[in-house]
Every structure is written in structure tokens, then in C-alpha cells.
Amino acid sequence: MEENQLTCLIVGETPAAQFLGWRLSLSNSFIILVSQYVSSDELVAWKSTKLGANFYTPNILTKDIKELHHKLKHNGANTYSIDIVLVSAISLQSFETTCRLLSDYTNDNTTVLISTDFGCELEPIAISYFGGKCKCVISISCEVECRQLSLGSYALVNDDQCVITLGLTYCDANFEASPTILENTKAASLELQGIKGSNVRRFLLGLTVAKWMKSKLILDPKQMALKMWELLIPKISLNILSIIYEQFDYEKMLENKSTEIIFKDLVKELLGICFAQCGSKIARFLLVKSQGEEEINFGKIVEYCKGKKLQLINSTANEHPEYLSLPFEPYCFYHRFEYPAQILLHQPIILAKKYGVSCSNLNFLYGFYTRLLTLSGLSINGGRCEHALSMLDSRIGGGINVASGINSGQDFTDGDNEDQDKGKNRVDKNVKEGSFISLTQRFTMTSPLGVNDPALPADLEKLYLGAEYISNCDANTSGGQKRVKSPTKADTGYDDKHLPDDTIHTFEDEYLADEDDFSCLGIDKRSSTKPTKPLEKFGVVAVPHFIRRFSIKRSSKDKSNDMKRPYTTSSLELQLRSNHFMFAKEYQDLHRQLYYEVKPRTQSELDARRRNYSELESQMWKIKHRFNIHRGALPRPRTNPYELLLDHIDVLNRGNTGDILRFTTSRYGGVDTYDSILRDQSTIMELLDKRCAYSPPVLFDNEAKERDHDRDCYQDYNHDHRSH
């Protein structure tokens, strides 16, 4: 480590904390990063429309804060003198734990920065652990739009401006009985003055090398607290509410009177907590009447959020499935990324109780959002929630225990066919056409490895869920066999079929339409059927299929064995996302089903079995042929104008190490595959024009003349023949 080099210890999972680490690394700072969301190669990738793609490797990286002891301690003494400690936690519990553990690595010259992007007055908690072990504790707010794309991959969505604000969010008047906090106020005031050589000054100089990054030092704690409440109130009152109501158009959401009442009550409670905590009001959200009276202007809060959203739309490629233009909280909820929701919702409740302010609506919102995360298989405190399913899920499918059936691999018999027939003409009003039924209502949170793997994050389990199976069977019954249903399904969508207009949309029909049917094989020994194995049992690594974002419409009368593609995607998008690694699973499934029965002993038994399984055998050889085309053993037939474009994309993918463009969300930014296609559009169109024509244009003219000559000769021959 160089002399006078700024040493920063960054602990946190939020994109803002990762962003600060990235920018500090470019200023030659010594970065010690603690984050579980970094890949094993220790590379942190950032993408930006203006800055391009950037990678950096922290000087020291650990995934768990407890591992710091082996890297920062030697014979009980600290190996490095830490200048800056940046803490950004997911929950209040993890925040306290992090502060307690980090206090062993600080010294009298260390400045502790607490991320207050999701909470106000967090410094007293940190001071209780760092008091006497550091120079001071200061709050930091980073107003920048960052999004996590995947493990160790982030996007800087809005790189036009970034404001870094430092200050204190607590008021001394509320802590007169705490000398430690009062001492921190004095030390922080000196540090915030930006004296030459101070840690804060060196920290900001490293960040503001880029001209679009600005910094603010607020010496008045009341103004800093007001600034934080100005950011927090719209997040809680509108963004969290939009997640619950699944409506991201704020004006449409507030057209509902009950929703509007909840929104206004939340704003009133939050402004009341703000006034009790810092003794000031947010002038931006107030309307001053002619008599000098002030009242809350709810429209300004809506306009504030709409303005932020418009900035995102103007600066992002708003394409499925990233949804980068969504506000930070809905984006994280959609992608199942962790963010400090517990601090965002629970810290105001703690402050309300401390200062004697009513917060009944905020309490209800916190409980409701916590339950919503629980049903999604996540915990508001971070990590996975073990109780992902509701007890009401057992009612799905006419009283069938879906959870136990899927976990055990048990087949569903046709005992509910009568109920299904009775309900054919009934349309569930709660399930609209093309609507989406949550996976948490249909599947348990099982590991893609076939066992409960506690090491697998819940968000990955959510993506993998149901992606390791594929249907290959006809829904028709053959040989008079009884229809049975398999509980597993995943649609690769190779076929592009249109659906009939008489599609019935009831809850039972949509659920049963997603079930596979093995009776097409003519197998009547279902009692001995083995549970369906996941892909990994065949040595195939499953990549998330993201099936929960698609809605498959299927008619209850549809008996074809064709796989239905998601109607929300285009043909090209579907071919790009088709899972070629499923070939081995398809082939193994058909092979197992084809030779399911005991090996025939006589030729007549063999012939009978071949007649029964002729269609299945044909499917198996088609899959084998398709697989040979995929691996290049056979040429791919030119059946549509997309084929050459797909070849071009394959070249781009294979030229990128590790197939990153295929399997990660890198369709955004300067390295985007689609962006490359647009740049090469003229070349691609010339390629299509040349390759789609099987012969040069001159030969076409010669062939046309030859065909005309042959046709004239043939007509002359027929005329002469008839004349005779």
C-alpha cells in the first residue's frame, strides 16, 4: 500500500455502497470490500451508457465480515490503518452486528460513514459501538440511480449527475443526556469543515474527479435531517405502496379512493415524525395559503416521484426483463434483490414511538409488506424465509396439496376431472385474461439441486423454480388409457402457434393446463413411476428460465402436444432465449419413456411395442437431429429470415468469454448484443440479401430463360402431339 493512500473499508450490499467503492478505486484508493454479492473471480462489473463497461477488483475482498479477522489482523494487531469505514446494512439487526464487529478494526483517526439513504438518525446506534474507537461518525447520502443486474454486476442508470451529501441527521437537543453523542457532534463538525488533510476531504476529492459527481457538506443537523426525510417520504408513501398494489403509475393508483386515503395518511404520519425528530417542516411538500397557513401539498409529492421516474425513462433502455426504469424499490422487489426495506419502514416507527407520534398506518404498511415478502419466500431482514407458502395454497387445484405433490414427485390422478368439466363454462372474475398467477401459489421453494440447499439464496431459487423440467407429451389419451397429470413443467417455447379464440380462463383450467400428461405414452403402470428428476441429475447445469414473467395461455380443449410459446415475447426473442442445454434432458426423458417397460422377449412383443411408441420414437430422433444441428454436426436449415441473424448473435456470444452475453443481463449498455446488431445493421442486411438468395441474380435470369424455353418446348410438344 502506498504512503498517503486512502484506505477504505466498505461493508454493504446496496448498489450505492458498491458504487462508492468503484469510484474510489479509480482514484487509487486502497479498497477493502465486504459483500456477499461478488462472484468468485472477485471482479465487480459496472455498466454505463456514457462511461461504458468497467471492471475493478478490490484490494481485499471477503464475503463475510467474520473473515476480516484473518486478513486484517496479525498477532492481534491491525495490519492496515483504516481511514474510512462505510457501513450500509440491510436491516437494523445486521446494522448493529456490523458496527459491533467493525469496531475492532478502527482507530482514533478513522472516520465512520453511515449510509442514510434508507433511514434517519442511525448515527446514535453506530456511536454506541464505535464511541471512543474512531474519530467521528457521520451520515452519508448518495443520490445516484444504481441497479444490481446479477452477481457482481451493476448498472449506473443515470450518470448525468450524482450528489454525495455528508452531515449529521440527529439533533443535540434530543441527546443532551448522552455525552458520547455530544462529543461526536463536535468532532464531526470539525471533519465536515473540510480541513486540508482530513479524511472527509480526501474521500470527496477521490469521488469528485468525475465532473458529474457533486458533493455537499451540511453542517446544520436539522437541514441534513430534512434532506433525508425529503428522500424517504416519497419512497415509503408511493414506491412501497405501488409494490403492494402492483401499479407503478402513481396517478392511476391514487384514482382508487381507499388507496388515496392510505397515501395521505402515510404522508401525514411521516411529516409528523419528521417534525418531532428535527423540529422543522419540509417546505417542498407544503402549500402556503394567503393567510400564511400551511397545509400538505400531496400533489407535489406525486410530481416529485413522477419527475424522478421520467429521468429514469429518459436515461435507460426500458426493455424486458430488466425494467431499469422502475424506481429502486420496485426494481429490487421484482428481481428479488435485497435492499434495506426493514430500515426504510421500521426506523420511522422506532422514531415515532420515541417522540410520541402516532404511526398506525405505517405500522400496518410495515406488517403488510413483511407478509408480502414472506409469501415470496424472502425475509424483510434479508435472506430466505422458510415459510414461503400460505396454508391456503392447499386449496389450489380442487383441494390437492400442491406443495406436497410437487416436492414428492407424486402424480395427480384424474379424480378432479368431473369438477373441471363442471367448471368449464365458469370464468373466474379474479383471474383476467393473460393474468399471472404467482409461483408462490403453485410451487414450494425447493432447491434446483433436488434437495433443500440452505446455501442457495432465495432469489436464485425463485428464478430456478420450475425451470429444470420440460414437457414432451401429448395431452391426448392413447389406447383408452386413463389420463394422469404430472406436477412439473417448463416451456421452452420452440413452436410458435396461435391459440383458439374459445380459450377458457378459470383458476382450475389455468392450473391444470400447466400440468404435463404422460398418458400419451400408453403406460398404465403409473404406480411404479419414479419421481421426475431435475436437470442436474443428468449432468446438465440449469440456467434460470425466468418463467414467472411469462403467462402461457392454453385452451382446456387443446389436445395438441405442441409446446406453447409465451405470447408476451417476439419470435426472435423467443429463439434467443430458448434453452439449448435442455436437449440432453429431453432426449433422456424420451429415451426413458420409450424403454420404460420390460424388454420384450419375442419379436411380436417387440413389434407391438414399436407400434405403441412409434410417435414417441419419432420425437426422440427429431430431438437428436436438432441437437446435432445445434452442436454443428449438421447444417441448420434456412427456414426463416431470423436464422442468419441468430448465427451472427451466436458468433458474438462465443466471442465473449464464458457466454456472458447469453446468460447474464448484459443487454444494457455499450456491450449490449442488441446494440452491436444495430451498429452492424447494414452488414447484416447485406448478408441476408446474399444468403437468402440461393443463386446469383444473373443465374436467376438465366434459369428463368431456361424455364421459359423448356415451357415453350413442352407446349409445342403437346400441341404437335394433340394434332396427331
Swiss-Prot record:
The keyword Nucleotide-binding does not apply. GO terms for biological process: ascospore wall assembly. Keywords: Cytoplasm, Membrane, Sporulation. Residues 407-427, 477-497 are annotated as: Disordered. InterPro entries: KPR-Related. One of its GO terms (cellular component) is prospore membrane. It is found in: Cytoplasm; Prospore membrane. Its main location: cytoplasm. May be involved in a late step of spore wall assembly. This is Outer spore wall protein 2. It comes from Saccharomyces cerevisiae (strain ATCC 204508 / S288c) (Baker's yeast). The gene is OSW2.
